[in-house]
Curated annotation (Swiss-Prot):
The keyword Iron applies. Part of two distinct complexes, one containing E2F6, and the other containing REST. Interacts with ZMYND8. Keywords: Biological rhythms, Chromatin regulator, Dioxygenase, Iron, Metal-binding, Nucleus, Oxidoreductase, Phosphoprotein, Repeat, Repressor, Transcription, Transcription regulation. This is Lysine-specific demethylase 5C. Histone demethylase that specifically demethylates 'Lys-4' of histone H3, thereby playing a central role in histone code. Does not demethylate histone H3 'Lys-9', H3 'Lys-27', H3 'Lys-36', H3 'Lys-79' or H4 'Lys-20'. Demethylates trimethylated and dimethylated but not monomethylated H3 'Lys-4'. Participates in transcriptional repression of neuronal genes by recruiting histone deacetylases and REST at neuron-restrictive silencer elements. Represses the CLOCK-BMAL1 heterodimer-mediated transcriptional activation of the core clock component PER2. The lineage of its organism: Eukaryota, Metazoa, Chordata, Craniata, Vertebrata. It is found in: Nucleus. One of its GO terms (biological process) is negative regulation of DNA-templated transcription. Gene3D superfamilies: Zinc/RING finger domain, C3HC4 (zinc finger) (3.30.40.10). The modification Phosphoserine is found at residue 148. It comes from the Eukaryota. Binds 1 Fe(2+) ion per subunit. Residues 116-159 are annotated as: Disordered. The keyword Transmembrane helix does not apply.
Length: 180
């Protein structure tokens, strides 16, 4: 069971009689609740920055008394700083930079392969009647193309090649495995 601050999270409206027009079902599904599952004051983005905490620790060291909360804060801050250092060290290692470079090459190659197909799609659609709306293939922010179900069937071979190439690079990764 999850616990939230009572003042931060609203109680769900469970009876459908409170909703106009929906009298057929007695209860609402969980995705229809008018609730927040994370307390807004406890969300990660509201946590203080490390610089702010370090300034607080410096101010705490000037006090003539020792506070257990200050010592706990210092311990947590040291852990965070050491974790950041280890993460930077791993990300700067030759193995990770080589793999990131290889992934960038693969992304560029995939984008280069998709560009001629897009130009063909534009030119073939342009010759059709004025009443026909051309199907334009969009691009996502990261540059990946949005494909239609028809194109997925034609590109299965290249997708399998890329998957095999990426899976061959997986054994080179070192460190603990995180399950998402």
């Amino acid at each position: 069971q999850d616990w939230f601050h009572g003042r931060c999270v609203t109680v769900p409206r469970l009876l459908s009689s409170q909703r106009p027009g929906f009298t057929s079902s007695p209860l609402l599904a969980w995705w229809e609740w008018d609730t927040k599952f994370l307390c807004p004051l406890c969300m990660r983005s509201r946590r203080p920055r490390l610089e702010t905490i370090l300034a607080l620790l410096v101010a705490l060291q000037r006090l003539p008394v020792r506070l257990p909360e200050g010592e706990a804060l210092q311990c947590l801050t040291e852990r965070a700083i050491s974790w950041q250092g280890r993460a930077r060290q791993v990300l700067a290692s030759e193995e990770v930079t080589a793999l990131l470079g290889r992934l960038a090459e693969l992304r560029q190659r995939l984008q280069a392969e998709s560009k001629p197909e897009e130009s063909l799609a534009y030119s073939s659609d342009a010759g059709e009647g004025a009443g026909h709306i051309p199907k334009v293939q969009g691009l996502l922010e990261n540059g990946d193309s949005v494909t239609s179900p028809e194109k997925v069937a034609t590109e299965e071979g290249s997708g399998k090649r890329d998957l095999e190439l990426l899976s061959s690079l997986l054994p080179q990764l070192t460190g603990p495995v995180l399950e998402l």
